[in-house]
Regions:
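Hydrophobic, small-residue-rich alpha-helical packing segments that form membrane-like cores
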Residues: 1, 9-12, 16-28, 32-39, ...
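M16 family metallopeptidases and their MPP-like homologs
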Residues: 1-19, 41-47, 97-118, 138-260, ...
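Conserved, carboxylate-rich catalytic/transport cores that coordinate ions
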Residues: 33, 420-421, 517
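Flexible, low-complexity linker/tail segments at the boundary of structured domains
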Residues: 37, 521-522
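Proteolytic maturation boundary segments
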Residues: 43, 51-139, 143-145, 205-209, ...
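Conserved short beta-strand edge segments in small beta-sheet-based binding/regulatory domains
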Residues: 456-460, 557
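Short Ser/Thr-interspersed hydrophobic loop/turn segments at strand-loop and sheet-helix junctions
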Residues: 613-614
Length: 675
């Protein structure tokens, strides 16, 4: 009612009401089906390796006798009236764990007859540019010491939430508890900064080449597109309209568009979108004692006040210096083995590192890199358990070399490349990918990850405050409470199995985490790098010699400590707890653990068991009993600790049915194991 006054949506959402579900008459459903499920509103989409003529003939034969309706009901879009003053909506939910603030700037949509032409592509290009630059500015704020929000973004998806008759330029943020006003003020000021001064040429250039890179990658992979991607595009075209020329034509047109649209045209568009009227402000958050929310009047007052605050033009400094300013003397490839397993080539380098190369033709525009070394988090003692909880999130927030994380992101504009370090229980890992044209950059990032980690206390302070704010109300989510209960039931009070909580930051040390990173990643001994994809071995050799053969290597290789992995509870154990919910349901998890030899036969057997039980439960529990939307099954044999087995079966169901459904689940498992 608050967001859609004067519209049908003010009284009822498109999904309907619970009253209809609980009290409908069968004839009403039949009448609805007859009214709307009809040939002129339906489409059949088939994508795959099929005989087109045969499939078309089959479709015509099967559906030819479906009659066209006489005097069919007209499908109309629900209109959304304009508003002069900002509309305010505040909603609280007992199960919500985040406070989310939205500002919608409603606008008319591009008419359908234009949206299906090149005008629609131009509009989408400009919208993508605007959203990309705004998100980059929000990211800069997030890396400051104490940002008012946890996350923020801007977008325009041509719909005003559920309403397809209006579009809306949308700015949204996850606000920290107690900082709703400051979050709203920041969003408004950044929006006004764009309205008054627009985007800078350098911002536009970065966004432009990033968009072009995305289209270039899609074009290069045009022959490797999956069937479901085509289906999604056709469904979207049928339901929402627009253009669908194919990636070849779209890529050609977009290159022309990007070269001919100046930053001034982009600025004019976004400044027109940020209007003085047709504004809606939405606020949702936890219904929890102690959380104070502004009144609608106060929220409006904050918005209007922020809109009048003076703002300065956006300023930034962007470095174009080399990622690796001083290159080391290249190392050597001391041994080459060709024709290895799966047709791979294996290099041994002068520093002892091994490199596995496997050229493939599955994707033209992608090279995948993984690197692992034995060791892992289990080599750290009890005093570092809390540090380990955030280790993978924290070790790269400072950036690399001479670049902060935000500066590095800007420096990599227009490149399809990524590289990330992580620590698992028994290994150190480096994962990355690149387009063949950006392969050198991937090697530079690998080299910097080992040799030039960068600390940024301000970025860490931001991470800590945002993470603590996000964790503050996690327990309000019933599924988080269930996960906590399940973890305790399986692992007891083992601190290595507990999730991160706000109070853990009292024992977390950023300097210590960076020391831990150095302990595990400053020595590349034991690492095996594997590159798979569109590789030319002669072209990649110089990069291997320059960037991998020069990594520091002291010859020290360690193995993870399986004794530090939390052990599972022995024997039968049931943990049942109640939690009040607005929409009652029961979540059931059956967990079975054991031990078996870790080998390929047993791994395949476990996979087969999971797939068989998926089919059995779909038929018996979902289709026959109507007891759940689906039963999830996972079956795993762990390589570390070696041979530990876990079979987990979980489902949601009606409180009145859970015991009956769980009996079926357990009985069907027993029958499957017998056979």
């Amino acid at each position: 009612p608050k967001m859609y006054p004067g519209s049908r949506y003010a009284n009822r959402m498109p999904i309907g009401s619970i009253d209809v579900i609980e009290n409908f008459k069968p004839d009403e459903l039949r009448a609805y089906y007859k009214k709307w499920y009809r040939p002129d509103l339906q489409a059949i989409i088939i994508v795959g390796d099929v005989n087109v003529d045969q499939v078309e003939a089959t479709i015509k034969k099967m559906f030819a006798d479906v009659p066209a309706p006489v005097n069919p009901a007209k499908r109309e879009q629900v209109s959304v009236p304009d508003n002069d003053l900002p509309l305010i909506s505040i909603a609280k939910d007992k199960e919500a764990s985040n406070t989310i603030l939205y500002i919608f700037y409603k606008h008319d949509k591009l008419p359908n007859d234009l949206n299906r032409t090149i005008a629609g592509l131009v509009k989408d290009y400009i919208q993508q540019i605007c959203a990309s630059i705004m998100d980059e500015r929000f990211d800069d704020i997030l890396h400051q010491a104490n940002p008012p929000f946890i996350y923020a973004q801007a977008y325009d998806d041509d719909n005003f939430m559920i309403a397809k008759s209006k579009g809306a330029w949308t700015v949204a943020a996850l606000a920290k508890e107690g900082e709703i006003d400051s979050t709203l003020t920041t969003l408004v000021k950044e929006t006004q900064r764009v309205k008054q001064y627009g985007f800078t040429p350098s911002e536009y250039e970065r966004a432009r080449i990033n968009v072009l890179k995305q289209y270039e990658s899609a074009y290069n992979e045009r022959n490797n597109q999956k069937n479901d991607a085509y289906v999604r595009e056709y469904v979207n075209h049928f339901t929402n309209g627009g253009y669908i020329p194919g990636i070849e034509m779209e890529y050609t047109l977009l290159n022309q568009i990007a070269q001919n649209i100046p930053v001034e045209q982009v600025n004019q568009y976004i400044q027109d979108m940020i209007g003085e009227d047709n504004i809606v402000i939405g606020l949702t958050g936890p219904d929890k004692e102690g959380i104070k929310y502004p009144t609608e009047e106060n929220l409006l007052r904050t918005f209007l006040k922020a809109r009048q605050m003076p703002v300065e033009p956006y300023k930034e400094t962007v470095s174009n210096e080399p990622l690796v300013p001083t290159l080391p003397t290249p190392g050597r490839i001391t041994e080459t083995k060709t024709g290895q397993r799966f047709g791979a080539t294996v290099f041994t380098l002068s520093n002892g590192i091994k490199v596995v190369l496997k050229p493939t033709e599955f994707k033209k525009d992608e090279i995948i890199m993984t690197a692992t070394s034995p060791g892992g988090s289990t080599l750290f003692g009890t005093k570092d358990i809390d540090n380990l909880k955030v280790f993978n999130d924290v070790i790269e927030i400072g950036g690399l070399g001479n670049f902060s994380a935000t500066d590095l992101s800007k420096r990599l504009a227009g490149k399809k490349v990524s590289c990330a370090l992580s620590l698992s229980q028994d290994s150190e890992n480096v994962n990355g990918m690149a387009a063949p044209s950006d392969l050198r950059t991937l090697f530079e990032l690998i080299y910097l990850s080992f040799t030039a980690p960068r600390m940024d206390e301000e970025a860490y302070a931001s991470f800590e405050t945002r993470t603590k704010a996000q964790l503050q109300n996690m327990e309000l989510n019933p599924m988080v409470a269930f996960s906590d209960s399940l973890s305790k039931a399986v692992y007891g009070d083992n601190p290595r199995a507990s999730r991160l909580r706000p109070q853990d930051f009292e024992h977390i040390s950023y300097p210590r985490i960076m020391e831990m990173r150095k302990e595990r990643f400053s020595d590349a001994s034991g690492f095996v790098f594997t590159f798979v994809g569109n590789i030319q071995i002669d072209s990649i050799r110089p990069y291997i010699e320059q960037y991998l053969a020069t990594l520091p290597s002291q010859g020290k290789i360690e193995k993870g400590n399986p004794a530090e992995v939390p052990s599972t509870r022995k024997g039968d154990y049931m943990n049942r707890f109640n939690r009040s919910m607005e929409i009652p349901k029961v979540t059931v998890a059956n967990l079975y653990t054991g031990q078996m030899e870790y080998n390929l036969e047993n791994i395949i057997t476990a996979t087969a068991l999971k797939q068989v039980m998926d089919l059995v439960y779909y038929e018996k529990v979902r289709e026959k009993e109507g007891g759940t939307y689906g039963v999830g099954v996972s079956a795993r044999i762990s390589p570390f600790p070696e041979g530990r087995t876990t079979l987990q079966i979980f489902f949601d169901t009606d409180p009145a049915k859970w015991e009956q459904m769980n009996t079926i689940v357990r009985n069907e498992l027993k029958l499957s194991l017998i056979h």
